[in-house]
């Protein structure tokens, strides 16, 4: 506030002033000059004012509808995964778009209402203030309160109860649209799910489908053929099966060319349905799809050129994790969990397209660029007696981005 006015006002003098006088005094003390001020609707009961109020009300009501729609979608809409051909696939597909549409409608409508109210009801005003320094005095504190009261009165919000109520309700709902998604985090990541370990792990951050190796389960590196299943019904109920080839098939080393990469998923021996063991009636499609959709299951199988493989720097304690020129790294970026789905064969770098982290495949998946701070976990692999690539063990560190309980 300004210290240019030498007059010291007593409490009695300040109490004797009206709110308008205090507001005017506040502008003078603050070296503010109101160069221009015009009321939007100087005539009482102006039809244009009523139209403007209805327009603001419309956007506020629309914002409330959007907020309620978001909460209803988030709480009641069927969000569980549905595979191709499942009943309810359309509703599942629309879940995320509905969240975006309703939350966007809520926030944008409230924004439109605020902008419209300012343009239609707040008086046009041009004020000029000279810059000055100095601590605030008692008179300044009193006058700023008066200025705020004056702003409240001139905004006419005090007599527009409907707009105030709608704005308050809309603001609360807009806040809920931001807070409600955090409900998805209200889950203890260390509580195992009911039932035994399966192809998606036990539900904790420590496990994946590859953890089955620790339970003496033979786990193959399964290539995704992207085969689409068809529904058929028999005496035991509805089943899904592919024709000619299953969704996941085992891989041999010769199936991958040098300087190339393949995304593989855990394929337990009991789910194998290819080669000499192929049985068109074997019902494994849904189980294999659970493996494909496992949040920590995706692994990049990389076959290096022989010349490049000779340059590899092994991580201490993981010297035997590879099989010849074949290296298997987790496909989950250690930054925030995006899929590191790009592989540059010429530079042997693994790229995450989300935030441009880069990992050196010749240096145990060490990050060399971008925000990722930890190397990609490496899966130990080998071949079995039939020549198929299998997991020789489980990952020795948690997969994906960091979390509080990690020590590194």
UniProtKB/Swiss-Prot annotation:
GO terms for cellular component: plasma membrane. [2Fe-2S] cluster binds at residues 333, 335, 352, 355. Binds 1 [2Fe-2S] cluster per subunit. Its cofactor is [2Fe-2S] cluster. Signal peptide: none annotated. PROSITE patterns: RIESKE. SUPFAM superfamilies: ISP domain. GO terms for molecular function: 2 iron, 2 sulfur cluster binding; metal ion binding; monooxygenase activity; oxidoreductase activity, acting on paired donors, with incorporation or reduction of molecular oxygen. It is a multi-pass membrane protein. Iron-sulfur subunit of the cytochrome bc1 complex, an essential component of the respiratory electron transport chain required for ATP synthesis. The bc1 complex catalyzes the oxidation of menaquinol and the reduction of cytochrome c in the respiratory chain. The bc1 complex operates through a Q-cycle mechanism that couples electron transfer to generation of the proton gradient that drives ATP synthesis. This is Cytochrome bc1 complex Rieske iron-sulfur subunit.
